[in-house]
């Protein structure tokens, strides 16, 4: 079986049979699958958002952990504002694209590219952080696996990549069960914990964390740091807005309903977990997560309900990365359409998924996981900057949008988006100030670097379009064509190449590089019989180089006729087995590479298929 057949069968086994374009509408999300695929990032963040707040407050003393509750309510209020703002964006921009499209239409090129860079970087970090956190949950339960955490993170990236390459509908089916399992298990935990609180059956959780004397003074900076840490609960909110075209018709209505459901669930679970952490006097620990401690306290130990919560939490943390797999390729395709990234990212694969974007996201996330050793705490400081940059630009762009339209109720709409822009802008400043010392400055550096690359890519495509333009061009000149057939001997492949060459031009020459005089004399004798009147050019090579004399001769012919074409016809063996290639030199490939960037020189191969 040929190599192409083996590769094709392997591809079909991994990603399934191709899907025709006319079935694209069947591959879209319902609200049920849309909530699972596009909201898993936002929903999963509640698993560690409360803990991130407590980890800062405990630096002062256990006594100030109660400040987590008002901080959580403030974050919940901001989340509600952002969701209502994005809901307006969904209806105003049903084509998707989120912050990039809104900023491009209303704020101009530069803000749009900043938004795009922020989102693309954040999507890569979403995959890395989510998978690292999920693997951390596994290795906490099975410490022996800790040494293999990098391999495990890469394995999960591979699973997510293959799942998404199979297409939108199948990825929705794969990821719906873990998402809803997490939602129901956490809501059950909160409901049972609330019932225990109402009946007065709450007992503080036993912990191995030593009680430490007061450390730092509770300052405004520490409160802001705790607040910025808790804002991880807001990551992923923009995913639904970016993925509107992935929904079944009516797209905007289904996406808006999905966003409201996501907001209600996220706020309920985040505030519920924070209240339970306060009720059970949970102290953050390096050995056990806050959700684990709450589940242990609510369910009275490590029974099956506890393991159900932990298992669901682990799954959602890993699968939260799937939100990025839904949105990164789609945003990249929009940027490719606008010529800011390579055009290959615009193409859909066999399964109507943006395959190149999916593979690229997997590669970048894998690099991050390897560089940072799969450590969640090393990756989290890089998080959130991109989110709030895109939030702020999107909402500011919507204010301009409503001011330009001035339709019914435009002032109310502009006020809602203006409030969203102001709030997210303030949060962005807080996050940038409190996270820069922990590595967020890298993201602040990467965003302008990406913008520079976007603009450089656009300049390249614009220059290509200018050079390819037919404006002012006349096709009045007839060009001659000199055809050269390099050969290493006289055989069937050469004779076949000569027959083809004679169909291209009347000026055909065979070219042979002489290294051995005896072999050259023998070849000249054979050429009289098989050359069919085609002139034979023999090039001497005193230093035994095959390439240099040939390239010099091609350059000489080209210089003699600078406005005409020179065509190189290469006789080329095609072995019956892929491994037979090792028995043949790759001279044809070397010639192609050497002539690739030479103008007016055309290189073509005439394959001679060898039988088995």
Report the location of each language-model feature.
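C-terminal membrane-solvent junction of multi-pass transporters and transport-like membrane proteins
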Residues: 208, 344-355, 391-436, 467, ...
